[in-house]
Amino acid sequence: MMKNSTYLSICIPAFGRLEYIINTLASIYKDAEDQTIPLADFEVIVSDNDPDKELEKLKELFPYQNFKYFNTDCEGFMNSFYALTYAEGSFLKLHNSQEIFKKGSLKVLLSLVKEHMKDKNVLFFSGGLLKKGKTFTAGSFDEFIQKTSYLSSWSNAFGIWKEDFDSVKDGIDLNKLFPHTSLLFTQNNKRKYIVNDSSLFSTQFVSKRGGHNKFQAFTIEYPSILDKAVIEGDITALTKSKVIRQLMNEFLPSLFFNVKIAQRETYDYVGFKENLKRHFPKGAYCKIVLLSLFAPANIIWRKIRIKFLK
């Protein structure tokens, strides 16, 4: 084993939402206690980019040796990158502040990390959203992106080995909305890609989420990462087309419903119709609006499926 005995770093970028993060941290430490997992096996890092440092009180609430709080001077989603820079474990996993650990999840994460300490295969945690409910393997980066589709953009699924992170962190051109996805796409020459699609976490509902143009993020920024991967030969044009199709048929209708119809979320919508013309097929806007009418049924079914995944 490596000199560093910390296998796993759970890296949580955060800005406010104290009550949610308290629940998340409590679930991690409760799971460790219930499963008798030594605190030395993992560390928990909170990178707080709020200048007011509201989350600094977490140090008093969670006085564990393996808990670390940092106030970070960075903008928006770049905090996902900086959270990783503080980590000292062998494997660095990003974790969304509102995602609560289910019973036994920490053990699953640690087991996978220990299993792949030598081969350093990519480990990806899709949370049951791929409808598999089990662990499966992809033999190439193109196959991996084809199978994970737009979930390759999900920060909570992302993880990277520290030695791989250290080798790319200084020279990488990061997308400011998807820095973790930029990092993921540097891991294009691995022998295997291990996707754990178990439902390991439950999401705390955050009312009226918003704050940025999420429509632009998924019509311009994320597709541009796919474009670059096609140009550099890391994925095929066919794989990119499949991901774009699934964004159009699944993700964007759900987002449109939540923002424009149900108004459960407050993401900026400016430029959506025009932005679709750059990467999406003709008629994409009308199709998304039509499919958004079926979004409630799809959302309910997805929640039921994830809840009962074993």
Pin down the residues of each PLM region:
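Glycine-rich, basic loop-to-helix element that forms the pyrophosphate-binding segment
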Residues: 71-87
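Conserved donor NDP-sugar-binding/catalytic core segment of glycosyltransferases
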Residues: 100, 104-137
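Short, well-formed alpha-helical segments that are part of the catalytic scaffolds
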Residues: 17-33
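Cell-envelope/extracellular polymer assembly enzymes that use nucleotide-activated donors
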Residues: 6-11, 43
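A conserved acidic beta->alpha catalytic loop
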Residues: 45-57
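Conserved nucleotide-sugar donor-binding catalytic segment
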Residues: 137-217
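Short aromatic/hydrophobic "clamp" motif used to bind/position activated sugar donors
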Residues: 92
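C-terminal subregions of glycosyltransferases and related glycan-biosynthesis enzymes
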Residues: 182-185, 189, 195-310
